[in-house]
Amino acid sequence: MQGARAPRDQGRSPGRMSALGRSSVILLTYVLAATELTCLFMQFSIVPYLSRKLGLDSIAFGYLQTTFGVLQLLGGPVFGRFADQRGARAALTLSFLAALALYLLLAAASSPALPGVYLLFASRLPGALMHTLPAAQMVITDLSAPEERPAALGRLGLCFGVGVILGSLLGGTLVSAYGIQCPAILAALATLLGAVLSFTCIPASTKGAKTDAQAPLPGGPRASVFDLKAIASLLRLPDVPRIFLVKVASNCPTGLFMVMFSIISMDFFQLEAAQAGYLMSFFGLLQMVTQGLVIGQLSSHFSEEVLLRASVLVFIVVGLAMAWMSSVFHFCLLVPGLVFSLCTLNVVTDSMLIKAVSTSDTGTMLGLCASVQPLLRTLGPTVGGLLYRSFGVPVFGHVQVAINTLVLLVLWRKPMPQRKDKVR
């Protein structure tokens, strides 16, 4: 194995893998992703309280959330292209520095001596560059073997689960004990440490030698990070539009439900804030287990096509049950199936889309994939609110069944192609 691995590293420049070994870089990437996600969910737990303290009503808070979603939606593909051109080190460092700016502005907004409302809205601006998870996915994609990739990407779900659980618990506990400003300051310190570790320990690039051969010559024209035509051209590659459409369509019903979940938990389930937090922690724990353990085992026994069809089929079953649920206990019974479908769909479609593009474009494609959730967070409050107000909770189950039945028929009529991984 060592002899086979040696040629793979010979083409790399000294600044690439010399800082840490391959496995150490992957492990550090997991730690950095978990740190950033923990800070992000700490921020999610304090922003509603801060906005209420500053006198914002529900409409203004909706504008605040929409602003963050739009900025992440627009910034995702551009950040991915930046990661492809400038490398993993620059991408992760930039993401952590943007997060640092956000948390510093958030801490300043909680100060009575400063214009809190303006600073709160200004704190949303760095969100355009906060894309640590896609950058981590790019590093793991570049450094993991093709057969190990679904499991390696799935283990990022452990990081997400850690972020949901620790971030929610730390945010609420610190706000109660030390005030709103404390979580923001702690998150700023953690992201500063993340920026330092990214700059000093992550390789300048994780791409293979063949990718470098495609780079522009010194003194020649360099492709722009903001070249939207180059970004959009990836969506016109063979099979990419269909895979991407499946990803967006199947995510849409669940995304609408999760955007409205805070309201549904209060109005429909009659939960207190602490109880809703416990339910989200349960959701995060299941996601950790599913992405960290279950998907890795399944991917070693079944093809991506089979797993994709299975996730859509489980979505349909969950949608049917969701249309009839009447209590939080019923929802808890549905959560394992919902989490399995959501995690499997995202991991498998991400893996398929990565295989469909060249190694020099993996970051851009992952940035496009990362824009799906901001898109749902942007449109979700309006569309989900209209559906909930007009038809109630069962409508989310009906929409889930209808859309995923169509997706399953498409997958059955024209199976996804089985691609071999690109030569590095």
From Swiss-Prot:
Expressing tissues: Expressed at high levels in adult and fetal kidney and liver, and adult colon. Expressed in fetal renal proximal tubules (at protein level). Expressed at lower levels in heart, brain and lung.
CDD domains per UniProt: MFS_SLC22A18
Variant or mutagenesis effect after changing residue 233 to F: In lung cancer; somatic mutation
Keyword check for DNA damage: no
Assembly description: Interacts with RNF167.
Function recorded in the entry: May act as a transporter of organic cations based on a proton efflux antiport mechanism. May play a role in the transport of chloroquine and quinidine-related compounds in kidney. Plays a role in the regulation of lipid metabolism.
Protein name: Solute carrier family 67 member A1
Species of provenance: Homo sapiens (Human)
